[in-house]
Amino acid sequence: MRRPVAVLSAFVVALVLVAISMTNVGAARSPLSTPAVMAFPAGDDWEPAVDSDGAGNVYYLATHFGGVPSCASCADPTITVQVSHDGGRTFDAPRPLTVGPSTQYDPQVKINAAGIVFVSYLLAKDTVVQRSDDLGASWSDPVAVNADVKQGPTDKDGLAVLGDDVYVGFDVAQKFFVSASHDGGRTFTTTQINQNTLGWPLNGGATVAPDGTVYMVWELIHKSGQAQGPQDVLVTKSTDRGASWSLSYADTGLPPGPACPTSCGWDFLGTGAAIATDQAGNVYVTYNAPLYDHGPPHAWYRSSTDGGASWSSRIDLSTDGTPSFHVFPGVAAGPAGDVRVAWMDNRTGAYNVWYRSSADGGSTWSADIQVSAFRSGYAYVTRQGFAFPYGDYITLALDPSGTVQLAWGEGPDYNGPGNTLYSHG
């Protein structure tokens, strides 16, 4: 979701200029497809989500600003959906999930083993879920997951699905919650995670292990007024289908991130986290954070083989060795030890999306692989990359066939207009 615009620092502009002076580090050839511009090629699209059932059906969501063509009743912004039935080679035209006056943000999409598609997003003050039982041809009406905790506007939803069990995390100011459904998203019961103030929470993602254990990752920002203080990466865990939750810190006391080189939302380049579990139940977390206050962020990786009771030493995912900004990391996992990661950085003087894989749970990794690519017709894209990340996150998924699904946003700056892109392989 777009956050209020923040005041910028000249110090960060200097850091960006340092990054621009660095040369590119050689990268391996990408195993993923040439990136495709999704939603509306003219923009303005932001914060995409993607998932695939592994049987050729791919679902791509984006937040569209500026009004949906031929939909006078659509909100601004509106969540749009595109569906592919040929494994992501072609997609139908974007269409709104919900037609109405209420603004929509932060789409998430997950698919269960039966091929039922679930989406969550912010609809006005609520966090809602819809489902499709016919490969995206039609969608149920939105169901507010927070109906039993009407305490204020919700933010930053995270979605996880296993069978008929649907879990949605969200926050209301300094409180954070998980709503659980055990009837396929038709009704929800909500549990408040924190009874005491732990910081300003933002959900980074959610996952369900094969044994039904649910994990969510949260970024906790400690602040006074608009000043950003230390930030934590918190993992919450439920072994009783969302009725109760335990807490495990993957990292704590992280320095606040840098300001932006142009106007941005609050804490836009601060800690952002993602989470995944493999088929053996191992847990993987990625997050970005600098080594010192307002310094250039690194993309970090940690894993747990004991359900979050302990965490491995953190690994710096990028091998470029430059003082560039590494932000918006994502993580996905499949069979035991099969881990995929992606992030954005500006090692070339512009931003690109980078990808790595590991077959042994992160003990060893492939080379850095550049996924994003030059395309003509967009002033903010050069041979070095794109000008700035567009949206608060990227989405990385690994479908049951072992195919990577990757979605991200690119733009001239935080305010856009920008575009969302898709690659798979």
Predicted feature descriptions by range:
Residues 9-20:
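Bacterial N-terminal signal peptides
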Residues 26-425:
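Extracellular, repeat-based ectodomains that mediate carbohydrate processing or recognition
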Residues 20-26:
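Intrinsically disordered, low-complexity boundary segments flanking structured domains
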Residues 1-11:
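N-terminal export and membrane-targeting signals
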